[in-house]
């Protein structure tokens, strides 16, 4: 079964977003006057999954090893362009004012970067006319037809992995040692544009220096625990915090987060 698509310039996909960025894209976004935030979640990682577990391998490659008390976890850091209302690059006529250097996630839309998220037009913000059969074929049986889209997806996936050591260093630069439990929410760090740009620049320098001095791969760097560093897992649900305490993990409610960190929860807060 095939899906046809053509952008109608409706602007629906350019409002109220958190757009995942590579670190290089984040610096461009900041240069253009936009806001960049750091999202962090933590995945308990007691054992290495089987080699044929593709989904776990995908998560693993985009995260770094850490400890929360005595619980091994993988920290998944995500740098995003954040805006409420229209994108700061959206022009009055609904054209993109940064079209030539827009983020790769924007370039591939409505395709999915994550290979484990099925392509579903119903999950997109595009209006029905965008999917009419008179337009070119966009996707056939889960495969995207356009070679440029394929290339941008591959480059986006590559940067997700290649940026991990620098994102780890970014957490260090911003003093981040708290993350939301995976599938419950995110800890969001909002240091401001100048502070974020300086932190990203320092993180990139630190990661490059570390890689050169240690002569290790990005994968090896992401798998090394930081001695003496323990992450606190944030949850707005008491039952989750109790469960984490049972496995000797460090946990806390969102109120424990320091400024400028915030909690975005996927579930209602519960103290029971």
Can you say where each PLM-predicted feature lies in the sequence?
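Short loop/turn segments that flank or connect secondary-structure elements
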Residues: 1-272
């Amino acid at each position: 079964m095939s899906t046809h698509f053509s952008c109608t310039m409706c602007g629906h996909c350019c409002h109220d977003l958190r757009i995942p960025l590579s670190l290089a894209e984040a610096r461009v976004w900041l240069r253009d006057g936009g806001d960049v935030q750091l999202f962090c979640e933590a995945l308990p990682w007691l054992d290495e999954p089987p080699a044929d577990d593709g989904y776990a391998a995908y998560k693993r490659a985009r995260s770094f090893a850490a400890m929360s008390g005595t619980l091994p976890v993988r920290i998944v850091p995500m740098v995003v362009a954040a805006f409420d209302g229209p994108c700061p690059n959206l022009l009055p006529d609904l054209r993109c004012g940064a079209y030539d250097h827009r983020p790769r996630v924007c370039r591939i839309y409505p395709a999915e970067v994550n290979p484990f998220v099925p392509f579903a037009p119903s999950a997109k913000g595009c209006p029905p006319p965008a999917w009419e059969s008179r337009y070119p074929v966009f996707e056939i049986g889960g495969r995207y037809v356009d070679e440029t889209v394929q290339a941008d997806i591959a480059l986006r996936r590559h940067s997700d992995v290649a940026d991990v050591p620098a994102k780890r260093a970014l957490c260090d630069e911003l003093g981040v040692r708290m993350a939301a439990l995976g599938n419950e929410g995110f800890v969001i760090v909002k240091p401001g544009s100048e502070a974020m740009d300086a932190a990203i620049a320092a993180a990139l320098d630190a990661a490059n220096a570390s890689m050169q001095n240690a002569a290790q791969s990005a994968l090896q760097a992401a798998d090394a625990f930081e001695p003496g560093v323990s992450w606190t897992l944030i949850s707005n649900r008491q039952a989750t915090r109790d469960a984490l305490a049972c496995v000797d993990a460090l946990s806390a409610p969102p109120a424990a987060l320091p400024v400028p960190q915030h909690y975005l929860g996927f579930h209602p807060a519960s103290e029971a």
